[in-house]
Amino acid sequence: MAPSQHPKSAAAPATTSDQMSTASSRPTNGTAHTSAETAYPSSMTDSKPTQSGPGSRASDEQDADEAYSNHSEQHMDHSNPDGHPSKPSGRKKKKKAKKGRAGSQTLGDESSTPLSTPSVSMSHPLPPPLPPHLGTRTILKSAKDRSIWNTSTQEERENIKTFWLELGEEERRQLVKVEKDAVLKKMKEQQKHSCSCTVCGRKRTAIEEELEVLYDAYYEELEQYANNNQGSFEKGSPIVPPPRLYQPPLRSPGQHTRTQGQFHPSRGRIHEITEDEEDLEEDYDDEEEDDDEPYSDDEFEDEETRAARADFFAFGNSLTVKDGILTVADDLLKNDGKHFIDMMEQLAERRMQREEDTQYNIAAAHQSLHSGHNHPPYDEEDYDDEEDEEYDSQEEDDYDEDEMDTMTEEQRMEEGRRMFQIFAARMFEQRVLTAYREKVAEQRQQKLIEELMEEQTRTEQKNAKKAREAEKRKEKKRLQKQAKEEEKARREAEKAAEEAAAKAEQEKKLEEQRRKREEQRKKREAERKAQEEERARKEAEKQRRLREERERQAEAERKHREQKEQEKKKREEARRKEREERELREKKAKEERERKAQEDQKKANQETPETKRTSHLGPVPIPANLQPQGSSSHLQSPHLQSASPAVPKAPTPAKARQPSQQGSHGSSPRSQQASTEPFHTSISPRSMAPSQSSGASSVASKQGYGQQPMLHHPQPSTPLSPLGSVNRSLPPGFASAGLPSNPPGLPGMVPRPPIGHELPTYPPHSGPLMNQLRGFPAPNGIPIPPGINGTRPLAPGRGFPLEAAPGLPFHTQQPIAGAFASHQGGMSHGHSRQPSGSFERSPLEPHAQPFPISRPSPIKRPPSTQQEQSDANRATQRDVDNLSAQLGSSALLDDTDIPFTSNLSQSLPGATAPGSLPGPTRASFGAPSLFPDPLASKPGGFPMGPGVGANTWGTQIPFVSSAFPGAPAWGTAHGSGWSNNAFGSGGHHRAHTSRPVAIRLLVIQACKQLDTMSSSKAGSGYHDVKIVLQQVEQLRPSNEPSIPLKEMLDICDTEGNTQNGGGSFSIKKDETGEFVKFEPDNNSAASGHRGSIVPGEIGSPVPSSSMPAFGGIGNTPSVLRQFSSPTGF
């Protein structure tokens, strides 16, 4: 019997170690052993060993304790203090290791003895004392438990027992029913995923029936226990302790180095319980409280300690029932229940097998436990490690098949039922304990609420008492304060009465003082008013005198101005008459000269028909009706054709006029024009050097047909005679050789004189070979635009103009005599000394070209005499002297006539010289020059001839270096077809102005016209704005948009200056309407008579050459001319 006592003797330490496995205390050496009485009641430790047998109550409770320990262990393992499930593997293994360590210390030398199957008459020895490392922790833990639920005392256990007995039958049945329903629900949920065959369906039905039977029997036992007040759960046959079928020998400590994954904690805690159900509930509660701590310090123990305690697991494995009955609580608490379902399936299979075949042997029954209907194996996580280890250890340790066959089928079934009853009892205990705790918690909560209410009531009473005392103190203070305030009010009333009396006396004194000051103030005010009236009267008198003085001065100035204007009108009328007479004389003289020239030309053409072949002289101009018609599409050779239809007469040189008579008129702006009278020029071939002629002839012989000879050969150094040539030209308005003198679409333009009419003092850049003279087309007949080919450079400092090339037609038409007459332009005379007697030809003189040596033509009689020319020059000179006396520097001395801010174009309008076109002013759009100068005149003595050739671009005139003495700077000669200016040649036209300026000028002009036409507002100068707008609309060009009244009034508010007409507008409104008046000043057009120039006056353009531009507001040359933008000097 000695060996059989080892398991029983080790049961108590195992139970104790499982209860305290979660205590977080490290092992301490030297701690005295503490008796079990400190942790357990005397009823558990002092009981004597009892007989354990089939009918023993102690053996039944040992088995029940085993099931309960498994249940509580798994419950605490998978439920953290916060209520969340923990990981199922790690925590369980740690608890197993700790339990193994706790139990291994109590085995000692007995661990080497193999365990045997316990006998029926097994006895229980007293449990050994607690291990030294658990004593202190157990005491502290018990104190903690008592402080929370106080379930370790006998009184508390009695309370639990009383609570159970006080429950009614319906409440007890309800607890059992809840337990049964939970298990059935779990079973059904687990069976959902199994197969739906007939066998499995029968198995499920058997499981449910088995559960019904088990729970019904369990409830009957509970009723008997409650009615009989017994200490056990059953009254019938006692629960037989589980047979120890498979008991492997204990292993040495060296074989358990990996205890955490190889072994499992004990699934049964076998200790002696002499008390009733409340003792078991106490054990369960202690373990549950101990297990709240998530970690334990025992986990940090070294491997040697773990290995030394690992052999305790062998004993724990030996207590595990084969069919896994003790793991049902673990499965249910893990919400898994697979092992419990497996057990129930086995029970159902056993039941079915008994019904079907009672002849099966034990081996077949054992195999049916593991191979029921080929279900898939459970998940590795769902399998408890203790099953794996116990089955492995059972297989490794050579199970005794003979012992396994000794148990009958009925014993196994009975064993299963008893294990289920133990499990159900433990689960039911938990529910009873939970119900009890809920009741206690509710009672304590109610008690706490009552205490809180009492506390609150006491606090309220205390606060009310304090409030009453404070109210009393406040009332007392209020009464004291009220008495003080009444006393203070009485004193203040007395003081106020005294102050009121004093204040009344003071007010009386102040009122007397104010009355005296008011009287003094009124007196001073009267004196100051009288002084101001006297001062205002004096100021008004002074202003009246000043106004009268200004009026007298203005009247005197007006009279003076009117007198000057009358004198000016008289002078201008005299000038106009003189000019008309002069023009008439010039016209007659011009007609006489033209008639003589035509007669001389006819005579020359009749007398020398054969001279043209050898003379190589240029043709003289002949009338268009005498010009032979012919056409040529190419340039002719310098060698003249033998079959020329017309041979011009070579002009005869006349005696040069002395320039001394020019000196007296040097200050006149028209002196250059008047002093430069044209004369005939006779250039004989004998004047050319033989070397030049011979050298040029060889060069000319090499030129291709239609090419122009080079013009850059050295020229003779003889000076050019200042004699001018006789004007030989067609009358104005006739075309040369039947070609139009104006471009198509531009009628009315007067052609300019031929080439050489106005050449500058300084030459332009030299051009290429072709088109040396502007106006001559290229050999292919296409005219070259201006600026491509230029003339050959003149000698620096010379102002000599070009002459037409006699006899060399540079155009595609037949040579025209009238278009190539030799003309000598007027020179710019800077001094009056006698020029050199040498003859120096111009560098661009066409006669300087090489010609072949031939017989000279006979000298003929000159067409006019020196006496006739002198008479004509004297008549012209008198006219220029007259003009110089009135339009010279003396015209600039009158400040009233010409304002200081006016342009030069206002004071000195250009006068037209006899026989030439008037020069355009600065404001002219149609000016052919780039920088025209109204002070300069055109070289005189040239007739109004037609254009030269058929060049549509016009004859290009070289650039001039000065703005005053010369002619236009970069213009074209009139009559050449197209002008360089895109707007054509014309009269006085304004420069580009903005619309507000143009509208203001139109309003000024409209007001002036209305001043002369009507006497509205009694001659005050105010005109209705609508009438003014109508007048402006009449003056507005048709191509400009209409002018609204608001825009005109807005522009009238602008200040006047030299650009927009000057002056100012006065606008006034009354009941009849709105009126406007223009008040001129020094910058306005009304300040002098020169602002408006009408045709026929001195400086006015010839009406035939005054052509308006194509666009722009206002075709009013008289107004816009004097406000043109100034040109550069």
Swiss-Prot record:
Keywords: Coiled coil, Cytoplasm, Stress response. Residues 441-608 form a coiled coil. Residues 72-85, 453-473, 482-613 have a biased composition (Basic and acidic residues). Its main location: cytoplasm. The keyword Cytoplasm applies. It comes from the Eukaryota. Pfam families: NST1. It is found in: Cytoplasm. Residues 1-136, 229-307, 361-413, 453-879, 903-937 are annotated as: Disordered. Residues 274-304, 379-408 have a biased composition (Acidic residues). InterPro entries: Fungal_stress_NST1, NST1. Residues 89-101 have a biased composition (Basic residues). Residues 741-754 have a biased composition (Pro residues). GO terms for cellular component: cytoplasm. Residues 626-673, 687-701 have a biased composition (Low complexity). Residues 14-54, 103-122, 254-263, 674-685, 718-728, 865-875 have a biased composition (Polar residues). Belongs to the NST1 family. May act as a negative regulator of salt tolerance. This is Stress response protein nst1. It comes from Aspergillus terreus (strain NIH 2624 / FGSC A1156).
